[in-house]
UniProtKB/Swiss-Prot annotation:
It comes from the Bacteria. GO terms for molecular function: ATP binding; homoserine kinase activity. Pathway: Amino-acid biosynthesis; L-threonine biosynthesis; L-threonine from L-aspartate: step 4/5. This is Homoserine kinase. Disulfide bonds: none annotated. It catalyses: L-homoserine + ATP = O-phospho-L-homoserine + ADP + H(+). It comes from Beijerinckia indica subsp. indica (strain ATCC 9039 / DSM 1715 / NCIMB 8712). Its EC number is 2.7.1.39. Belongs to the pseudomonas-type ThrB family. Keywords: Amino-acid biosynthesis, ATP-binding, Kinase, Nucleotide-binding, Threonine biosynthesis, Transferase. GO terms for biological process: threonine biosynthetic process. The gene is thrB. It holds the Pfam family APH.
């Protein structure tokens, strides 16, 4: 989450007039994250999150995201619910941007990713995969393998200002991934961005999943790889195999991985690391002037990629097959 677009009091009042949630009492920008403009909204009738969609989110995809959240909620997954206005629409416009109000979930992001929480996240991800299996909406992964080289080309000539030889390292990894990317794996709806700040806890209990704006239809194992990268590394970029074991235990408590998925995970983890290194690199080099956003360090994910380049089998990630 972040703030790129600022909202005037007059515009907010006009926007809220079409809803049955009362007048605004508090509107506070949320600096965390990098994709959309997000605000904590308190009205006379409760607490909400107001999102203005920017950058990589295309307006045509919003019905998929909003419909998915409603579908997952009906299947028992605790996630934000779009608030509909009096005309029955969840999607509106505010400050020249597509805008949505969603319900506020109690809980805080996981500042500490210990093994217990990794297990809870693994189980929650598997339940998400199961719950989304019969969702009728379709959306291809706009940041999948096919998007990485074009994305890289937008910053290739500046990459080495971030780290020496970074452009060559990325180009070499792209060549490898394009030659070895796993195909024909089980797929369905994936979250694709289930980082610790998108998982809420109340104490040690997982209370909800948020930020579904990269959700798409892709390989379930790729979603797992993203989570391993987000949850199972230590601050010094060493991989904690105990956390990996806990994550897989939680996931397979709900859904067993196929042999093909397990074998593919080392390559998928490399791809997941490069995907986030690339988008972070683009963001790092293109922070809009005046934006309330804290860009993430792309070199963190290059370090994770370097680890995965040494991995031979999924056992080294914690799946004991």
């Amino acid at each position: 989450m972040a703030v790129y677009t600022h909202i005037s009091e007059t515009d907010l009042k006009t926007f809220l007039a079409s809803y049955d949630i009362g007048n605004a009492l508090v509107l506070k920008g949320i600096a965390e994250g990098v994709e959309n403009s997000n605000f904590f909204l308190q009205t006379e009738r409760g607490f909400f999150i107001l999102t203005l969609y920017e950058k990589r989110v295309e307006e045509k995809d919003l019905p998929f995201f909003l419909g998915l959240m409603e579908h997952l909620s009906r299947r028992g997954l605790n996630c934000p619910q779009p608030v509909h206005n009096r005309s029955g629409h969840a999607l509106g416009r505010l400050a020249g941007r597509p805008a949505v109000i969603v319900t506020f979930l109690e809980g805080v992001g996981a500042d500490v990713a210990d093994a217990r929480r990794c297990a809870a996240v693994g189980e929650a991800l598997a339940r998400l995969h199961q719950a989304g299996a019969d969702f009728a909406g379709k959306r291809t992964n706009a940041l999948g393998l096919a998007a990485w080289r074009p994305l890289f080309e937008t910053v290739r000539d500046r990459a080495d200002t971030v780290a020496p030889a970074l452009a060559a390292t990325i180009a070499e990894e792209l060549d490898f991934l394009e030659a070895h990317w796993p195909r024909a794996l089980p797929q369905g709806v994936i979250h694709a961005d289930l980082f610790p700040d998108n998982v809420l806890f109340r104490g040690e209990t997982l209370s909800g999943l948020i930020d579904f704006y990269f959700a798409c239809v892709d390989a379930y194992a790729y979603d797992i790889a993203i989570c391993l990268n987000a949850w199972c590394f230590e601050p010094d970029l060493t991989f904690n195999i105990g956390k990996g074991l806990a994550f897989f235990t939680g996931y397979e408590h709900v859904r067993k991985l196929t042999a093909e998925e397990a074998a593919a995970l080392p390559v998928l983890a490399r791809g997941g690391a490069l995907r986030f290194a690339l988008t972070r690199l683009v963001d790092w080099l293109n922070v809009p002037k005046g934006a309330m956003v804290n860009p993430k360090d792309p070199l963190e994910y290059m370090g994770k990629l370097a680890f995965h380049q040494t991995v031979g089998t999924v056992r080294e990630l914690g799946l004991l097959r």
